[in-house]
Swiss-Prot record:
One of its GO terms (cellular component) is BRCA1-A complex. There is a cross-link at residues 152, 411 (Glycyl lysine isopeptide (Lys-Gly) (interchain with G-Cter in SUMO2)). This is BRCA1-associated RING domain protein 1. The lineage of its organism: Eukaryota, Metazoa, Chordata, Craniata, Vertebrata. Residues 183-229, 299-328, 369-410 are annotated as: Disordered. Residues 542-546 are annotated as: Flexible linker. Residues 316-328, 391-403 have a biased composition (Polar residues). It catalyses: S-ubiquitinyl-[E2 ubiquitin-conjugating enzyme]-L-cysteine + [acceptor protein]-L-lysine = [E2 ubiquitin-conjugating enzyme]-L-cysteine + N(6)-ubiquitinyl-[acceptor protein]-L-lysine. The gene is Bard1. PANTHER family: ANKYRIN REPEAT DOMAIN-CONTAINING PROTEIN 39-RELATED, BRCA1-ASSOCIATED RING DOMAIN PROTEIN 1. E3 ubiquitin-protein ligase. The BRCA1-BARD1 heterodimer specifically mediates the formation of 'Lys-6'-linked polyubiquitin chains and coordinates a diverse range of cellular pathways such as DNA damage repair, ubiquitination and transcriptional regulation to maintain genomic stability. Plays a central role in the control of the cell cycle in response to DNA damage. Acts by mediating ubiquitin E3 ligase activity that is required for its tumor suppressor function. Also forms a heterodimer with CSTF1/CSTF-50 to modulate mRNA processing and RNAP II stability by inhibiting pre-mRNA 3' cleavage. Its EC number is 2.3.2.27. Pfam families: Ank_2 (PF12796), zf-RING_6 (PF14835). Keywords: ANK repeat, Cytoplasm, DNA damage, DNA repair, Isopeptide bond, Metal-binding, Nucleus, Phosphoprotein, Repeat, Transferase, Ubl conjugation, Ubl conjugation pathway, Zinc, Zinc-finger. Residues 20-113 are annotated as: Required for BRCA1 binding. It comes from Mus musculus.
Length: 765
């Protein structure tokens, strides 16, 4: 058998090029080749372009743009024809984030290319699919079902057969909804059919021009229901809905994914605005009231998209609008439409949910879980309309005043997220700055307990974190499961944010509900070296919270209650009530802000202890005398009872957990000195839980509980004790002593002493 000759490479002959070596020379050649292969994998299975809002049908592995499968929803895959249910449709937010990161990497690698190449790539990743149909889906907390709306435009991006040309103008996608359709009055259906027969080829633009020529009534409202129905009857693919009046200072949550139940049947054409474009100052709204609705909207639409890529317009309050019962849900991403429909879009305002419909889903949040939610906003660059002349004029105009207090707090989505939460999640720096400048609370919590600072630290938006801290965001406020912003930054590995938080007084020893410190969440040596340094600036957050809440205390209502006062002191307190226009209570409730005691020490009365646990001002009676002499409200800090009352107030201002957070109590035996009902009220006010059955120290279920008490001292074994058996210790009869693992025996006097000192005191052996 002949031997194979050995392969010899001559020194004058270059070695063969590897298979992955690209043909072009230059820096990062292998990275460009790998990125090109990645782009091929990130293409739509139908249009072969870079994916835009990637969607999978659930029955196969094909991934499409959300606009490419609007005609296949509920039928099957257009590539492999696999049947697919409409409820299996799912938006892949993780893949969308990967596409955006790929776009950023592409811009870094091709910054030396020609400007034409950069322009083509920017358009490829930015607006390549803006003229396609888009499907929007959301989860309705009221009906517990997923709903879908297909947005239809009148421009075809792909060639169609000739027989479909005539049907294109007035076509509308219809599919089986997840919920039964809302009943439509017969008169409205008859009017719609009659209008369709009389005007079969009338365009939306022509109808809108006719609407502007109609004479206005005296009060600019419809006189009868029939006229209102005729106003809503329009042929073609759009259904204009009359806009309800906007209250001054009101903020639209259309971009933040507020969930509102739809009351109009059919597919509604709508537009989603960038976040900052939804914020309209009161003066701007009042100026727009002087002009008709449609002229102003058309003007804003034209100015908002000069290149045909319109993202949205300001929605003014008009006198010609009437309140419509149609609430249109929207996803949080802006969807571009061609300029042909810019003059024909009538935007609909969405009202906020009633408090009874707000739901908490804290287990389906964050990162991978939150990325699959159609309502969550994927990280992205700031909206392009923030740089246009209209927005710059609005930002620099003196008419941009602060929003009315309380209005932003009521605008929440079904998770309790405000506009500031959504902007912090997206990393939208201009919107965050605008919201903070207009009085939005940086320490507001959603239903899970997360603040905007938590969201910014978790998603790695350093500039947003710095903005929030500049506007007095609290650095140690715990969120869900008592995780602090430092916990989120460390778990996500953002070392720059960790440095910023530590420089602003973030606690290195803060623990969550499982007793885990931030340093226990990382193996990064650089982050661990920062977290293992000794504590500094311990008083920073304390002084910070005093600055934050000073204005709130001055502007808030005053509610007094006296504890242990004489009849003469009660009369003087009633006189102060008239002078300061305050309110005086006889029984303690949640509205009490000031508890007045006669001496320099707090008393162990029920009113005083409830005031301490609620974080109220516990003041000496000298404060009442000083206010009566000066006829104004004096500073409370000079007259505050030191010790436990002061610690409790600072704990409340820092939004920290209550005293007995993570603790469980079983009241055993009879209680005479402090009645059982009073002890139950105190435990509930302190955040503790009451057990109806005596805990068993030798039970494996009891001893395997891995939660800790938040306010226990870190170096003590009391941190891991979470269940207390409380007994009355003022009698000679004492129960058997129990101090085993999670279960300890504690006297009732210890419970009262902890409340008065507002700390978990050590138990004597």
């Amino acid at each position: 058998m002949p031997r194979r000759p050995p392969r010899v490479c001559s020194g004058n002959q270059p070695a063969p090029v590897p298979a992955m070596e690209p043909a072009t020379d230059g820096l990062w050649a292998h990275s460009r080749a790998a990125l090109a292969r990645l782009e091929k994998l990130l293409r739509c299975s139908r249009c072969a372009n870079i994916l835009k809002e990637p969607v999978c049908l659930g029955g196969c592995e094909h991934i499409f743009c959300s606009g490419c499968i609007s005609d296949c929803v509920g039928s099957g895959c257009p590539v492999c024809y696999t049947p697919a249910w409409i409820l299996d449709l799912k938006i892949n937010r993780q893949l969308d984030s990967m596409i955006q990161l790929s776009s950023k990497l592409q811009n870094l690698l091709h910054d030396n290319k020609d400007s034409k190449d950069n322009t083509s790539r920017a358009s490829l990743f930015g607006d390549a699919e803006r003229k396609k149909n888009s499907i929007k889906m959301w989860f309705s907390p009221r009906s517990k079902k997923v709903r879908y709306v297909v947005t239809k435009v009148s421009v075809q991006t792909q060639p169609q057969k000739a027989k479909d040309d005539k049907a294109q103008e007035a076509s509308m996608y219809e599919f089986v909804s997840a919920t039964p359709p809302v009943a439509v009055p017969k008169s409205a259906k008859t009017a719609s059919r009659t209008s369709a027969k009389k005007h079969p080829k009338k365009s939306v633009a022509k109808i809108n021009r006719e609407e502007n020529l109609r004479p206005e009534t005296k009060d600019s409202r419809f006189d009868s229901k029939e006229e209102l129905k005729e106003e809503k009857v329009v042929s073609c693919s759009q259904i204009p809905v009359m806009e309800r009046p906007r209250v001054n200072g009101e903020i639209d949550l259309l971009a933040s994914g507020s969930v509102v139940e739809p009351e109009c049947s059919g597919s509604l054409t709508e537009v989603s605005l960038p976040l900052a474009e939804h914020i309209v100052s009161p003066d701007t709204v009042s100026k727009n009231e002087e002009t008709p609705e449609k002229k102003v909207c058309v003007k804003d639409l034209r100015s908002g998209g000069s290149n045909g890529n319109r993202k949205g317009c300001h929605r003014p309050t008009t006198s010609t609008s009437d309140s419509c019962g149609s609430n249109i849900p929207s996803t949080s991403r802006g969807i571009g439409e061609p300029a042909l429909l810019a003059e024909n879009v009538v935007l609909v305002d969405c009202s906020s949910l009633p408090s009874g419909q707000l739901q908490v889903d804290v287990t389906l949040r964050r990162k991978s879980n939150a990325s699959d939610d159609p309502l969550s906003l994927s990280p992205g660059t700031p909206p392009p309309l923030l740089n246009n002349s209209t927005h710059r004029q609005m930002m620099s105009s003196p008419s941009t005043v602060k929003l009315s207090s309380g209005m932003p707090a009521r605008k929440r989505n079904h998770r309790g997220e405000t506009l500031l939460h959504i902007a912090s999640i997206k990393g939208d720096i201009p919107s965050v700055e605008y919201l903070l400048q207009n009085g939005n609370d940086p320490n507001v919590k959603d239903h899970a307990g997360w603040t905007p600072l938590h969201e910014a630290c978790s998603h790695g938006h350093l500039k947003v974190v710095e903005l929030l801290l500049q506007h007095n965001a609290l650095v140690n406020t715990p969120g869900y499961q008592n995780d602090s912003p430092l916990h989120d930054a460390v778990k996500s590995g953002h070392i720059d944010i960790v440095k910023v938080l530590l420089s602003h007084g973030a606690s290195r020893n803060a623990v969550n509900i499982f007793g885990v410190r931030p340093v226990d969440y990382t193996d990064n040596e650089n982050i661990r070296s920062l977290l293992l340094l000794p504590e500094e600036n311990e008083s920073f957050s304390t002084s910070q919270c005093s600055i934050v809440n000073t204005g709130q205390r001055k502007n808030g209502p005053l509610v007094f209650i006296g504890s242990g006062l004489s009849s003469q002191q009660q009369k003087m307190l009633s006189k102060l009530e008239t002078v300061l226009k305050a309110k005086k209570c006889m029984e303690f409730d949640s509205t009490v802000t000031h508890v007045i005691v006669p001496d320099e020490e707090a008393q162990s009365t029920l009113k005083c202890m409830l005031g301490i646990l609620s974080g109220c001002w516990i003041l000496k009676f000298d404060w009442v005398k000083a206010c009566l002499d000066s006829k104004v409200r004096e500073q409370e800090e000079k007259y505050e009872v030191p010790g436990g009352p002061q610690r409790s107030r600072l704990n409340r201002e820092q939004l920290l957990p209550k005293l007995f957070d993570g603790c469980y109590f079983f009241l055993g035996g009879n209680f005479k000195h402090h009645p059982r009902d009073d002890l139950l009220k105190l435990i509930a006010a302190a955040g503790g839980k009451v057990l109806s059955r005596k805990p068993k120290p030798d039970s494996d279920v009891t001893q395997t509980i891995n939660t800790v008490a938040y306010h226990a001292k870190p170096e003590s074994d009391q941190r891991f004790c979470t269940q207390y058996i409380v007994y009355e210790d003022l009698f000679n009869c004492h129960p058997e002593r129990v101090r085993q693992g999670k279960v300890w025996m504690a006297p009732s006097t210890w419970l009262i002493s902890c409340i008065m000192a507002f700390e978990l005191l050590p138990l004597d052996s």
